[in-house]
Amino acid sequence: MIIAAYQGPSPEGDMVQAFRKINETLAQAAKQGAKMVVFPELYLLGYNQMHLHEELAQPIGGDWEIQCATLAQKHQCGLTIGWAERDEKKIYNSASTFDSSGIKLGHYRKIQLWGPIEKSIFAFGDSYCTFTLDGVKTSILICYDVEFAQHCY
């Protein structure tokens, strides 16, 4: 399975540009045979845009997830993307994975928040997600989470 990774600038709050870049990246990756494209932690809005996360975080099933699912289906290429999720009064550093038909396979909230800034804005996640992608059991972890062996069991 070919998995592509987007390594480039974040949209820094420009959602039109963010979804334009997701669309372009999925199209290019799919043409090259990728089955999945992975975008960075908090790609939507940008990692260092903490004031925007508080202001613009969206709920599960909101417009951002709908657009991501639509683009994955359009290009027949899976997508894993980091975003700020609002659940009532809490905000999570989250990531969602969509398969090539636009179905959401997994959703994860970062458990190991890093540093005082993340901890001041985001709530701690408390569960894992696993799913099967093209016959392979897989999961989502976000950045600092990978430093803790207990997440691998």
Q: Where do the model's predicted regions map?
A:
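Active-site-proximal beta-strand/loop segments in catalytic clefts of secreted hydrolases
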Residues: 8, 82-84, 142
